[in-house]
């Protein structure tokens, strides 16, 4: 089809639909009319002048019969043209210009009835075309001759009956169905024959009413008359050849009547112009299939098709922008996402969609608009996910850094615990009645050790507080992604029933809430892992400091080993030391171990009483200063101000009146030695509960400190902790005893010397004044005292508490024998020295050799020294040894480091060169040339 052609065939002679009607309407700018157009069709006998009438009435160019070539079928099938009434618009007043602008009429020229060319098959096509015209047209022109009135066939009586039956069939199912204008054009009419009113009455009485009475009508239509379905108009037209001027005048009058009076203000079938082509296609296909032509169903079908088509066009137009933004969101956070999504995506797409789709059935239009929104929300969800994932990673890093920085002082603090004074925790407990909370905190933070203990004692509280701030920050950022949609909530039930939409019926604003739960799950799991990672580190530091403290306490055991004389006394002293350490750890560090090692059991509670809200903060009443609350200061409430900075690592002045529950009964912080299954689900469930509190602006009540205090009162739990402390103490004690066993010889020697070398007054013994018999007596006494330590360490008695960890005779026999041999050897040396002093009056030593002796030795041995040096250089012994040593060092120390090896080689060759020169110099000095050679020179 050529562009701009004013007519087109829509149904061919064989009854097939021509598929290019939509393109024709687009080419002729008929696609964007909305409802501002009309449709008129003409029915009548073949060669009755239908096309001629339409060409004169609407300025169309339908083919007309050439009478000089004889009567024949001219119009085959159904043809469509249009008239925009441009001439009338230009000649009318400004008011009518505005009224008539862009309101054309589509003209449907139908193949004539009673065609001899179709023969017996004509009735089928006539019925189909009549049904088609009535389904489409605001006005149906019935073209007949005046002289045929009274005839059955020529007057189109059968056609008229078909039209009326079909109209009743079409529109009886549709409520508020539009009335079809039935315009009878009586051709070749003369006023002299009969006034037009007479002709009108004849048509009404002998045709319309008679047919209506004869028709089989449904019950709901039996009491109705023809005026409920049709608007009857009768127009007489003069003879087109004999009185051509009068004919043209009558046609112009009819044209004016159509423009100003007859035509409806909008298309009565309520089919937008952009869906007219598809509607025609659906109607004709339904008629051809001999299916029941249900106009409401056809309209729904068209509405569904067109709304889907419009939706897809809108999606195709916006996909590129969404895709570009989605790619961008992989690299950075999309700033002003809410504004961009609302204006550039949602509102723009809805405006483009409703511009055309609003002309179709409302329920289908709104349902499809929800499908459009669902698609857009799905695409935007990917961008929101990328934004939230970036925020999640940032918040996880921030959480880890802040919690790590908060406990950084505990990592760098290397001093062991001092149990010589009351612990800071006990001080808090004892002074709570007389000292303000701020004064207590100021005292607690006087030194790093107290800070560490205080931080460890509140690890769960600190982690939970930081976690809550993190969730608040996450939800605040998430809310910036939610989109507000302006919609007519009165009609849009689909939007009302959407779980992701929050409706504000007063302002007709719907807020779409994107899904944040997958990202929240990742965030909660990451916080759980980071918290436990830091918790494990701090627990390790606490254990190491505790073990080092225990180890330092056992240092005095070395000194006690030198003086102890009784096995029972030694081990009783050890038991007392163990019990003291156990009690000190239990008194000072139990709360730390509960926070860092023990399993936490807490319930999440929601506190709703005595609190007030405004739009920015969650505010609550908390009477911390009341006397009634002094003994119950662990029931703490929390509120979040979105303007607060969550940088808790810098906040050293937090207090216990703000506390948070971190877990359900299973606990978010499980025992560090257990990997409990389902921990991710537990974290996610608790995160959802906290988000619900934040969303609903409910106050958060914690029972962490209360539960910890209950545990401190639980005898069974404390007993288990004490056993754990005892295990740690005994591990250190075992290591200490192993160390003592390895140094058994040294201890024996020290015990021997403490008795052998010193008298009862701890004065050094003067061996010159002691007789040999007395020396032997002292030796035996010292030896027995020294070797007594073996029996003491072997623990051959029953020792309560320690027997569960250390068996009797726990030192191996080979270690004892080895220590004895080494100790005996040294003891004998000490005894020989004493004997020598006793005999000579002084101790054997090189210091006793006179200096003169060394000078004489050097003078007499000078030749031997030079001979020894010359021998080494002559045999080249020094250089090979030096090279071998250098090679070994370079191989073991700098293996693989070629640069270091090159430096070593340079140094070796330099030293070798100088050593060789030195060797030549020594040879020259040692072997002077003979005197006769010197004289010859």
Swiss-Prot record:
GO terms for biological process: endoplasmic reticulum membrane fusion. Its EC number is 3.6.5.-. SUPFAM superfamilies: P-loop containing nucleoside triphosphate hydrolases (SSF52540). It is found in: Endoplasmic reticulum membrane. One of its GO terms (cellular component) is endoplasmic reticulum membrane. It is an enzyme of class 3 (hydrolase). This is Protein SEY1 homolog. The lineage of its organism: Eukaryota, Sar, Alveolata, Apicomplexa, Aconoidasida. The gene is SEY1.
